[in-house]
Amino acid sequence: MKILRKLLFWLILVPILLVLLMQLYFFLQIGWWVNHNPDSTSFMRQQLSVLQDKNPQAQLKHKWVPYKRISNNLKRAIIASEDSNFSGHEGIDWDALEKAYEKNVRKGKVVAGGSTITQQLAKNLFLSGDRSYIRKGQEVVITYMLEYWMDKERIFEIYLNVVEWGVGVFGAEAAAQHYYGTSAAQLSAPQAARLAVMLPNPRFYDTHRGTAYLGRRTDLILRRMGSAELP
């Protein structure tokens, strides 16, 4: 019995220690990124692997640019489209989550997510695209770590540089070049609004750029951009 108790003790303790070590890794890695730009993210590496399964020579389109070299049009458009209370919440917008839940219940399917910019960044940096309560819980923990270490401008700068914008396209600079042949600094308001609208499903819109929904949503974001509060 004594041996069984010891075995049970270690069977319980070891997973707990592994989880705690993982959280420590996340915490310290985020602290490092306060002053150092991430070379890639978990999601970027995952997508590169998918592309290279089809073409071993495939590479991602990605170029880091500083926050000040990204058009305010794009910043305002993304906040208006993805997270209107970005400057006001502490990582999770509980009101937005409640509204998204109510909308999904009315529609009978998932049509709204309610994830903030910080939550999206947490997922992109460290996690897979799998959907589970465990992954969602980890996303929440990383979200609060990001908000602890970084100010809003730094969170937004990293987000703008690593978010997916198409098939193998990551970051504002690569997106501006891919879709409009210009730099992220030179994006016009209509261009920025369209890029922001693509974010929920970028690979689809990369190959379906003329959909009616994309046009309608772009017009709506253009009207909302003026009230977006930048960090």
Curated annotation (Swiss-Prot):
Pathway: Cell wall biogenesis; peptidoglycan biosynthesis
Recorded GO MF terms: pentosyltransferase activity; peptidoglycan glycosyltransferase activity
Sorted UniProt keywords: Cell inner membrane, Cell membrane, Cell shape, Cell wall biogenesis/degradation, Glycosyltransferase, Membrane, Peptidoglycan synthesis, Transferase, Transmembrane, Transmembrane helix
One example of a Gene Ontology biological process annotation: regulation of cell shape
Gene Ontology, cellular component aspect: peptidoglycan-based cell wall; plasma membrane
Locations listed in the record: Cell inner membrane
Transmembrane residue ranges: 7-27
Main location: membrane
A Pfam family the protein falls into: Transgly
Catalysed reactions listed for this entry: [GlcNAc-(1->4)-Mur2Ac(oyl-L-Ala-gamma-D-Glu-L-Lys-D-Ala-D-Ala)](n)-di-trans,octa-cis-undecaprenyl diphosphate + beta-D-GlcNAc-(1->4)-Mur2Ac(oyl-L-Ala-gamma-D-Glu-L-Lys-D-Ala-D-Ala)-di-trans,octa-cis-undecaprenyl diphosphate = [GlcNAc-(1->4)-Mur2Ac(oyl-L-Ala-gamma-D-Glu-L-Lys-D-Ala-D-Ala)](n+1)-di-trans,octa-cis-undecaprenyl diphosphate + di-trans,octa-cis-undecaprenyl diphosphate + H(+)
Mode of membrane association: Single-pass membrane protein
Enzyme class, spelled out: transferase
Family classification: Belongs to the glycosyltransferase 51 family.
Known function: Peptidoglycan polymerase that catalyzes glycan chain elongation from lipid-linked precursors.
PANTHER family: BIOSYNTHETIC PEPTIDOGLYCAN TRANSGLYCOSYLASE, MONOFUNCTIONAL BIOSYNTHETIC PEPTIDOGLYCAN TRANSGLYCOSYLASE
Name the record gives this protein: Biosynthetic peptidoglycan transglycosylase
Native species: Herminiimonas arsenicoxydans
